Regions:
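Structure-specific nucleic-acid interaction/processing domains
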Residues: 1-89
Protein backbone atom coordinates (compact mmCIF):
# COMPACT_ATOMS: atom_id res chain seq x y z
CA UNK A 1 0.00 0.00 0.00
CA UNK A 2 1.29 3.51 -0.81
CA UNK A 3 1.51 6.43 1.57
CA UNK A 4 2.72 10.00 1.29
CA UNK A 5 4.83 12.10 3.62
CA UNK A 6 3.93 15.76 3.20
CA UNK A 7 4.67 19.13 4.69
CA UNK A 8 2.40 22.09 5.26
CA UNK A 9 4.19 25.44 5.24
CA UNK A 10 2.95 28.67 6.79
CA UNK A 11 4.08 31.15 4.13
CA UNK A 12 4.05 34.05 6.61
CA UNK A 13 6.70 32.62 8.93
CA UNK A 14 7.98 29.50 7.10
CA UNK A 15 7.07 27.19 9.98
CA UNK A 16 6.29 23.68 8.81
CA UNK A 17 4.18 20.72 9.82
CA UNK A 18 5.16 17.26 8.57
CA UNK A 19 2.54 14.55 8.28
CA UNK A 20 1.65 11.27 6.67
CA UNK A 21 -1.38 10.12 4.74
CA UNK A 22 -2.75 7.23 2.74
CA UNK A 23 -5.10 9.67 0.98
CA UNK A 24 -4.18 12.24 -1.64
CA UNK A 25 -2.46 15.27 -0.14
CA UNK A 26 -5.26 17.47 -1.44
CA UNK A 27 -7.83 15.45 0.52
CA UNK A 28 -5.63 15.47 3.60
CA UNK A 29 -5.16 19.25 3.37
CA UNK A 30 -8.94 19.71 3.19
CA UNK A 31 -9.27 17.49 6.28
CA UNK A 32 -6.76 19.67 8.14
CA UNK A 33 -8.73 22.80 7.23
CA UNK A 34 -11.99 21.17 8.32
CA UNK A 35 -10.49 20.12 11.65
CA UNK A 36 -9.01 23.58 12.21
CA UNK A 37 -12.41 25.25 11.95
CA UNK A 38 -15.07 22.61 12.62
CA UNK A 39 -13.56 19.83 14.65
CA UNK A 40 -15.61 17.74 17.01
CA UNK A 41 -12.39 16.59 18.67
CA UNK A 42 -11.44 18.94 21.56
CA UNK A 43 -7.69 18.32 21.16
CA UNK A 44 -7.81 19.75 17.63
CA UNK A 45 -8.63 23.18 18.99
CA UNK A 46 -5.22 23.32 20.71
CA UNK A 47 -3.17 21.94 17.81
CA UNK A 48 -0.52 24.52 16.86
CA UNK A 49 -1.15 24.02 13.15
CA UNK A 50 -4.88 24.55 13.55
CA UNK A 51 -4.46 27.59 15.79
CA UNK A 52 -2.18 29.13 13.15
CA UNK A 53 -4.66 28.31 10.38
CA UNK A 54 -7.42 30.08 12.29
CA UNK A 55 -5.25 33.09 13.20
CA UNK A 56 -3.34 33.54 9.93
CA UNK A 57 -6.00 32.31 7.49
CA UNK A 58 -5.76 29.23 5.31
CA UNK A 59 -4.51 31.23 2.33
CA UNK A 60 -1.12 31.39 4.07
CA UNK A 61 -0.68 27.61 4.08
CA UNK A 62 0.51 25.34 1.29
CA UNK A 63 0.91 21.58 1.18
CA UNK A 64 3.75 19.81 -0.60
CA UNK A 65 4.47 16.15 -1.24
CA UNK A 66 7.83 15.06 0.16
CA UNK A 67 7.85 11.35 -0.59
CA UNK A 68 5.53 8.61 -1.80
CA UNK A 69 6.51 5.13 -0.73
CA UNK A 70 5.16 1.65 -0.25
CA UNK A 71 4.75 0.54 3.34
CA UNK A 72 3.72 -2.67 5.02
CA UNK A 73 3.26 -1.64 8.65
CA UNK A 74 2.12 1.38 10.63
CA UNK A 75 5.56 1.36 12.27
CA UNK A 76 7.24 1.83 8.86
CA UNK A 77 4.93 4.75 8.10
CA UNK A 78 5.59 6.41 11.46
CA UNK A 79 9.34 5.84 11.10
CA UNK A 80 9.40 7.51 7.69
CA UNK A 81 7.51 10.53 9.07
CA UNK A 82 9.97 10.85 11.96
CA UNK A 83 12.90 10.69 9.52
CA UNK A 84 11.45 13.60 7.52
CA UNK A 85 10.77 15.64 10.65
CA UNK A 86 14.41 15.18 11.71
CA UNK A 87 15.64 16.04 8.21
CA UNK A 88 13.64 19.28 7.99
CA UNK A 89 14.05 20.55 11.55
Amino acid sequence: MNATIYKITNTKNNKIYVGQTKQTIEKRFKDHIRHAFNSERPNDLNCKLYIAMREEGINHFVIEELEVFEYTTRYALDKKEIEWIAKLN
